[in-house]
A protein has these predicted regions:
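Rossmann-like adenosine-cofactor binding region
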Residues: 63-66, 179-274
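C-terminal helix-to-coil terminal segments
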Residues: 2, 14, 18-19, 25, ...
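Conserved acidic E/D residue at the C-terminus of a beta-strand in Rossmann-like folds
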Residues: 176
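Oxidoreductase and adenylate-handling cofactor-binding alpha/beta cores
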Residues: 110-129, 163-170, 300-308
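N-terminal glycine-/charge-rich "phosphate-binding" loop or analogous flexible N-terminal tail
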Residues: 1-51, 328-332
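Phosphate/diphosphate ligand-binding glycine-rich loop within oxidoreductases
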Residues: 50-128, 142
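Short acidic/histidine-rich motifs immediately flanking catalytic phosphotransfer sites
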Residues: 48-53, 71-73, 201-204, 228-230
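Glycine-rich NAD(P)-binding loop of Rossmann-like domains
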Residues: 126-160, 187
Length: 332
């Protein structure tokens, strides 16, 4: 009897023909619904009890979905790193394995943060806009070496952001709920401190932590009040870490100077969001993971994780291109 897999990862669906030889080799039938950004709870419930494994993006695997899909569902293989959209407690209760690719998008996300800092410091987007509107206006900028960076969440991405900041001779503050390795502190000169000190001393604040109960709405009216009036908030992690209305209020009141956002509390960002009309805000559609090399690695590791979770004994010497790629990924 063929195993069935609900295949809903938006970044993989366009290339599904590349992956089919692997699934055919192991007699896996794919269920591929139409997906825009993600599958919501009600969308997933339509397939409850009909699949053995899942390859997903940010689909809403709530406790209700997990309970409805058990006991048939054995593994959820997440494309990417973040698993905050999956109810881990419910999966544990029903013995459903959750898999992901750690350190998947460290480099492109860190590059994105650096790009935002340079844009706000050197003011290129704003000068370009003025020039194209027929205005010859010199907008004052600053060097990154004159700025301090606060990194909230000093994991893989936070460390990569700090290393980039070090190359620009920035003062770096860090905050994390776990102890950071002494060798990294010595390498970068990062000053690990409490959140209040970080916020009150940083010209740029980069959010690079996971979304969890300790970080939900970490940035709110109280924490925005601690920031410098010339400071810029950068969020390339998860939208709900920032209380969006509090951010809008802080920007409108001039409590902070600007924001660069790749993620939002609701995605896609509603068309009536005040953020869309703010000149001191840079926006992107959750795209900081964009990197052909990173995507390729994650595609195949997601498949490998699925096979592992289904208990499939895959061959390291399979002749097909797809399975050979899976084998190479497994060896890494």
């Amino acid at each position: 009897m063929k195993r069935k897999v609900l295949f809903t990862a938006p970044y993989m669906i366009p290339f599904v023909d590349r992956f089919k030889p692997v699934f055919d080799r192991y007699e896996i039938e794919l269920i591929i619904p139409a997906v825009q950004e993600r599958m919501e709870e009600e969308d997933l419930l339509k397939y409850a009890g009909k699949f053995d494994g899942a390859i997903c993006g940010d689909d809403r695997y709530t406790a209700r979905v997990i309970e409805a899909c058990a006991p048939r569902l054995k593994v959820i293989s997440k494309w990417g790193t973040g698993i905050d959209s999956i109810d881990a407690e419910a999966c544990s209760r029903f013995e459903i394995k959750i898999c992901r690719t750690l350190n998947a998008f460290t480099l492109p996300v860190a590059d994105t943060v650096l790009g935002y800092m340079l844009a706000f410091a050197r003011r290129q987007p704003w000068m370009d806009r003025e020039m194209k509107n027929g205005k010859w206006e010199k907008i004052p900028g600053r060097s990154l070496s004159e700025c301090a960076l606060g990194v909230i969440g000093v994991g893989n991405i936070g460390k990569a952001v700090a290393r980039r900041a070090l190359a620009f001779d920035m003062k770096i503050y860090g905050n994390d709920i776990i102890q950071i390795e002494k060798v990294f502190i010595a390498e970068t000169g990062i000053e690990m401190t409490d959140l209040q000190t970080l916020l009150s001393n940083s010209d740029f604040v980069s959010i690079n932590c996971d979304l969890n109960p300790t970080s939900y709405h970490l940035m709110n009216s109280d924490t925005f009040a601690l920031m410098k009036p010339n400071a810029v908030l950068i969020n390339s992690a998860r939208g709900p870490i920032v209380e969006e209305q509090a951010l809008v209020d802080a920007l409108q009141k001039g409590q902070i100077a600007g924001a660069a956002l790749d993620v939002f509390e609701r995605e896609p960002l509603p068309l009536d969001s005040p953020l869309l009309k703010m000149d001191n805000v840079m926006l992107a559609p959750h795209n900081s993971n964009s990197s052909p090399d990173a995507w390729e690695k994650v595609h195949w590791n997601t498949i490998k994780n699925l096979l592992d979770g289904l208990g499939i004994q895959y061959s390291y010497t399979d002749a097909s291109t797809g399975s050979a790629q899976v084998s190479r990924t497994i060896r890494k």
